[in-house]
Amino acid sequence: MNTSFQAVCEAAAEEWDVAALAAGFSVGEGSPELAAVGCAPETPFRIASVTKPLTAALALSLLDPGEPTGVWPDDVRVRHLLSHTSGYDCELPEADLLRFGSGDDALARCAAELPSVERLLAPGEVWSYANTGYWLAGHLAAERAGASFEDALTERILRPAGLAETSFAEPGLPGTGADSLPGPYPRARRPSGGLSSTVGDLLRAGAFLLDSEQFGRMRIVHGKPVGGVYGLGLFGERLGGVDVWGHGGSWGGFQSSFLLVPDRRAVFAGLTNASVGGKALRRVEDAFFLHVLGEPRRQPGFVALTPEQRKAFVGTYRNDDGRHEVESAGDGLLLREDDDEQLALPVGERTFLIPSGPRVGDRFDFPRPGLGRFGGRLARRD
């Protein structure tokens, strides 16, 4: 690496005003390289949805991907829960899961309300991010194990992987930024994002997954998000002709990144306590890719759409995340969400990318007439 990894992390944290950032990578059997800014390398952060690959590994160790759930209709199978293709919405109608308490029955109480979740489409039709699927998968895995979800994950995944610093305890520092939240993480949400961990432990988790029996099934493509593909608990993309798998996380002022390059036996982990931390980590990821694959990620090229093509997407879209107002503007679309306004340019016939500003690189698309997908979640047009 021409520039030291520590220097890359320092520059990324400064550019995005991130209070604390820890990152590291390992390649093959070599010693891991770690860096930290504003914290120690071994500081535990909330990893949020980086929990999902570990939940998926647990579920696949206990459940058949083709079996029904017993909670949603029988056309919804375990594989749909783990691939965000269940057709169900992301959250319960009443989103505050703290109401289920902190007892061992919290996840079961949550699962009992899952029949009330809005069904958007039939399973397998369109990929739409759904935490609800992971709560149900975690509940089913716990039932099959005859234990709480936390105990099942610890005994079957965390302990065998040697993740001594990974747990459901609160992180070692607070989240910051517009998305920061006070109070504890709801126990019922834990299968979708409840773990706290360190960079070193996530590198060990990556090595464990690469060698695991479940990893091959986790890489079978089941859905297509706005960019790349999704297997069971892992996003996938190709970079320089090489497959890259992983997951990001975002919750309560923490953002995280976890990447696996199987052909190079390489693992990357990045943790921040900032609501814009993912943008800083993107720069650090590029340094990792340059080192391992010889090139960073490339932003897709923009394409030209006619005014008539752009007009087909204009309107107000709604989901339980809010209103998404879309207007035609210049060569692209103007997206308004709450007090935020972003110009996005087309990178495909139905896909748009924000080229600059605090949300640079974010994408949204329109997978079907009358449906938009914002932040990975489907929204219906009025």
Q: Predicted regions: what is each one?
A:
Residues P44, G66-E67, D75-R79:
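Alpha-helical scaffolds flanking conserved acidic
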Residues F25-V27, R238, E337:
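Residue-level signal for short segments within beta-strands and strand-turn junctions
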Residues W16-A19, G30-P32, W72-S256, L260-P262:
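Short, surface-exposed loop or secondary-structure junction motifs
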Residues S257-S275, R373-R377:
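Short, well-ordered beta-strand elements
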Residues V37-G38, A274, D320:
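A generic structural motif
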Residues N2-A48, P65, P115:
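Short, conserved catalytic-motif segment at the N-terminal edge
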Residues R282-D382:
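Peripheral terminal and inter-domain segments
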Residues Q6-C9, A23, R46-P65, A137-A142, ...:
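Active-site SXXK
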